[in-house]
Amino acid sequence: MYYYWEQSSDLIKMLIEYDIKRAEIITDSKRNYNTKKYDKYIVLGSGFDTETSRIKTIKYDTAYVYHWQFSLGKREYMGRSLKSFDEFFNFILSKIPYDCKILCFVANLGYDYYFCKNHFIKYEVSKHFEKTVRNPLVIEIANKIVFRECLGLFGRSLAQIAEDFCETKKLKGDLDYDLCRLSNTPLKEEEIQYCDNDVKILSELGEYVFQNYFGENDSLPLTAISELRNDVKKEMGDRYFEIKTEIQSWMPDDEEDYYLFRQWLFKGGLCGTNSLLMDKHLKDIAHADFDSHYPSCMNHFLYPMGKPIRTSTDNFMSERKPYIAVIKFSDLRSKTTHSILSSHKAMDLSREKLKNYSSIVIDNGRIWRADEITFCVNDIEFQSICQAYNFDVEKTEIIACWEFERYGRLPYYLLNVLNREYRKKTELKKNGKSNTLQYMFAKNKVNGMFGMTCTALYMDEFIIDDYGEIMPKRDELGNRVKRSYQDAIKSVFLSPFWGMWITSYARSLLINFIVKFPNCIVQYDTDSIFFRTNSNESKRLLEYIEKYNVECKELNNEIFDGDTYFSKLGTFELDKYLMTDFKGLGSKRYMYRQFDEKEEDFVIKSVVAGCRKGTILEQFKFDTGLEPEENLDKLFNYFKDGLKIDKEHSKKLSSTYIPKGYYDGKDSIDIWYSDYNNNLEKITLESAVVLKPIEFNMGVSDIHVRFYKTIQNIYNNMPAEHCKIFEQIMDSFELEELQDD
């Protein structure tokens, strides 16, 4: 049930006091880092949220809070201005016992905090933790109310949180944010219910957290990855400090070496389109993906143990040891029309240099050819480069080299946690429980293990200034203050090189398939390949997948002593149905049509980084008035370089943070403004975040056309041994058609 402060403040005060006095008190099992004491929490689920309107005048473009809502236990309290929130917040602080706290969840803490910061700084900000300036995870006020960001902690939207943890479900649809509402704007009951609904969900989430995260040895983590870290630490048991000390001794002595490896050696998943098939509407495409790609790499391969020690460049790859090297490649040329080396990881190239570099050919952000180019690689990636590229061995120079003590399997405390969750996930799926909360938790933990191994050192230090601004800490000269390298590695308990090697192994497996079957593979995306089915090469690919799977199952049988729940780990799984239509436009940009057994019909899906699912189909219907399923040729022709999604369909928003002094040198100002009903009202404008709808442009920067021309120019001047490869490829396509594009 909800209550408005402006109408029922006396009743609200009585209810809050009554609920707090009756509530159970629970003690956190982990000491507070600042106070060194165990925090006590009032066991009442709580949530906070604001509703805002954009305010545009001749001078200002800002936003205004016209409604706030705060839930506590089974009740929701609301108000129509930040002035009333001030009164409410001051009262609730006064009723919390001095040694207790309220845990309050927020669905977008950075956003809501910025509107309220001028009001919060009247009290002490007793604790705060943030990943970046705009991304606080914890804001604690006066040692009494702990605001916690919930979306990052649980790794899902508020709607999904409601679905997974709460009785109350997110209401479908949104408030019409184009309507300007102010504090005196009458709200319809459905609008009030929308406000009420979100904080109800947050309160129920709080109840779930108290039941599941405040046991004898449990504590609420900051993020989902933090929870995994706790699982691994528990697996270490009494050896935790011993293991942690050893791992920290493996960190590079030289801080610059660590940052060099972190910036240039660590690479993400491999994604891309076969350049000769980019922007082509293709038929009958098969899809296969690795089962739990990263977890399989963690189980199947060996990893660096010990500290990277700088050694002679002559030692690179001289023994069966892990190596890292900075290598300047000479006359580097891809053996196929696929490119695997990212231009962003080239150490000697700036973005500006790339634009005017005639001796380098860029294929959609990746290096296809370069006269000279420098990369930081490990021994696994070097083997992949040798597989995918030709280069002049004699002129290629190893600039620097590091070696590790040995290769070894990942330690038991990692693999035990990973494999326990993988087995649980597989067992639940086999028993038809893949829609359960238990399955989701297990799957998230399996997928999160890789992320935990490649977490960067936390170096930044932030402060909250007198205006409530979260900002980087700076010294007297204005230079940004960061934690020292030696201080930062005190929190390390896993080798950062394990994560770097996991991605190298994952990429190498994909590269192996791409290089062996370059003509029929159309698209690849981290752990999957899309390939044509109408050629002899595709038949050989299917045979190779079958052979690979047999070998993979034999390895699993050996590692897991015949446990059938692990038999498919790392195997390639083929989709049951072909994609009747497919088109690729580069990394993370493709669209396809495929039969879906759940829908019992064909579905059209697009995967475009930064674009909401279903957006392209909505825009197509809006622009053409046609149904996608009935106009496939027109739809796939519509999906092309230069496609624009307008503001109404993109649902993308840009954020502008109103700085201090924005209002003619002041931090706040009173103005008269009209709501959507033309009701005039005097409002106070202060700190705010302005959300502006923006369009989405899908541009490929003319790389497609330029690259084809480059291929033709290179082909005409190629050595004979290279020409043979290209002749085999070119024979598979209608070359004149490519030139016409």
Where do the PLM segments sit?
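C-terminal, non-catalytic extensions of nucleic-acid polymerases
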Residues: 210-277, 306, 333-522, 531-741
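Acidic, Mg2+-coordinating catalytic module of metal-dependent nucleases/exonucleases
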Residues: 160-244, 510
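A short acidic (Asp/Glu
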Residues: 56-60, 113-120, 205-206, 231-235, ...
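Short beta-strand
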Residues: 130, 520-525
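Conserved RNase H-like, two-metal-ion catalytic cores of nucleic-acid enzymes
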Residues: 2-104, 115-137, 258, 263-281, ...
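Conserved DEDDh/DEDDy metal-dependent 3′-5′ exonuclease domain
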Residues: 74-183, 194-197, 201
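Conserved catalytic palm subdomain of right-hand nucleotidyl-transferase polymerases, strongest
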Residues: 48, 148, 280-294, 442-446
